[in-house]
């Protein structure tokens, strides 16, 4: 469960290392973001000499949360960190690689490009 002011790791090679959530995008006024939700975030830490810089406002999709994800078949998935992938306005990832395991549910939210870049899909 990601809420505003939550710090997240970045799971791609876009140039950002750490993000802070400032808004959750969705119908109504969602209080928490879960896996597959799009957020507006600010870059808190970035790699030098990369296109993304510190204090830049970007969009990202949540790919891992410490809060467990329950599937319909009874399986519960829990990750060790909160992580996101930086995306553009069309929903395509800005990086060319994705690090770490990615849940299968992202395919249902039309983030197939992120799923195809991932080394492991749970």
From Swiss-Prot:
PROSITE patterns: RIBOSOMAL_L14. InterPro entries: Ribosomal_uL14, Ribosomal_uL14_bac-type, Ribosomal_uL14_CS, Ribosomal_uL14_sf. It is found in: Plastid, Chloroplast. It comes from the Eukaryota. Its main location: plastid. Keywords: Chloroplast, Plastid, Ribonucleoprotein, Ribosomal protein, RNA-binding, rRNA-binding. One of its GO terms (biological process) is translation. GO terms for molecular function: large ribosomal subunit rRNA binding; structural constituent of ribosome. GO terms for cellular component: chloroplast; cytosolic large ribosomal subunit. Part of the 50S ribosomal subunit. Belongs to the universal ribosomal protein uL14 family. HAMAP family: Ribosomal_uL14. This is Large ribosomal subunit protein uL14c.
């Amino acid at each position: 469960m990601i809420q505003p002011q939550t710090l997240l790791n970045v799971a791609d090679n876009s140039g950002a290392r750490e993000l802070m959530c400032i808004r959750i995008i969705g119908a109504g006024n969602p209080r928490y973001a879960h896996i597959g939700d799009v957020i507006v975030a600010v870059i808190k830490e970035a790699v030098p000499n990369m296109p993304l810089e510190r204090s830049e406002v970007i969009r990202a999709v949540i790919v891992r949360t410490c809060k467990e994800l329950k599937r319909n078949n009874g399986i519960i998935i829990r990750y060790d960190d909160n992580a996101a992938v930086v995306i553009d306005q069309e929903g395509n990832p800005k990086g060319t690689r994705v690090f770490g395991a990615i849940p299968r549910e992202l395919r249902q939210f039309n983030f197939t490009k992120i799923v195809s870049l991932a080394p492991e899909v749970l």
